[in-house]
Amino acid sequence: MTHDIAKFSAAAWQAAHLAGKIIRAAWHQPRSIDYKGPIDLVTSTDRAAEHTIIKVLQRELPSHSILAEEQSEITGVASDYRWVIDPLDGTTNFAHAYPQVAVSIALEFSRQIILGLVYDPLRRECFRAVKGQGATLNDERIRISAVDKLDQALLATGFPYDRRDNADFYLRF
């Protein structure tokens, strides 16, 4: 099947860009923080960014389904397309004014990711990848490192919220 990747990518960028404006506007403001779990935060900025993303995607692609972090599943009209949204990836960082946050949006077709967009609104960097077409940073092609040995590579990671329940698993890394 041929996908209208240009249209989908443009909608994702428009949604991420508007959500990024919300995040930047809130950056130096007091934060309203709620807890979904002991270490799982949500802010009014998460909710506002998510609302904006959903609004854009529903307007541009009304038949698509949406899975959003704060609102759960919003189903379109029997679509094989589903957007997966984290409106403020790095909420804990945002809550502590640590400048490592992003808007993350992906598009699935029949449960296969075909498009991903990660926008850092503080640096105004937009990473985009399309299945089978590679990845870009601000529309310039990027490539992976040529290093092929793990002990010579630079690695960075974060640990998920279940890290306490699965400490043995994560310590093996």
Report residues per predicted region.
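N-terminal subdomain of lithium-sensitive/metallo-dependent phosphomonoesterases centered on the IMPase/IPPase/PAP
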Residues: 1-88
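Conserved structural elements of the adenylate-forming
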Residues: 98-102
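Acidic beta-strand-loop-alpha-helix segment within the catalytic core
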Residues: 106-173
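Glycine/small-residue-rich loop that forms an oxyanion/phosphate-binding "nest" at active or ligand-binding sites
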Residues: 82, 94, 105
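Short loop/turn motifs at secondary-structure junctions and domain boundaries
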Residues: 75-78, 97, 109-111, 119
